[in-house]
Amino acid sequence: MKSLNKLCIGFYGTSEFSLSFLKELFSQNIKISYIVTKPPIPSGRGKKVNISPVHEWGLKNKIDVLTPADMKDRKFLDYVKKRKIDFNIIVAYGNILTKEIINIPDYLSINVHASLLPRWRGAAPIQRAILSDDKETGVCIMLSLIHISEPTRLSA
């Protein structure tokens, strides 16, 4: 395995939660080849088109930002396949990755989920834990495998 400062990753994330992970990876001198985030959406009273916090950060740091509407889009897949990456890091992205994307890195695809699985699977685990007055919560780090319902937990 390469040393940390020689690693190259593809990062998939959208939220403020995922941005904290992205910033930490960047601070460790891990090369971020590209960022994949949800497409900009109109919101608010004026229906202004807003980009995600991850998208904004990527642009400020001159990292390629991709916003595919379809994870099976040929142009998107060709782009990410051409980039030699060691890992995919997925943190609160908002879409399920295809088998093809999961298998792109030389090593692994790793998913970070903001709950102690299986308690709050799916979207908004932090909000659901708060609304349920959970006394204990955490983060799970797992391998992303072909069958998303059967992750292999690396850490909790």
Describe the residue ranges of each PLM region.
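One-carbon transfer enzymes
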Residues: 1-149, 153
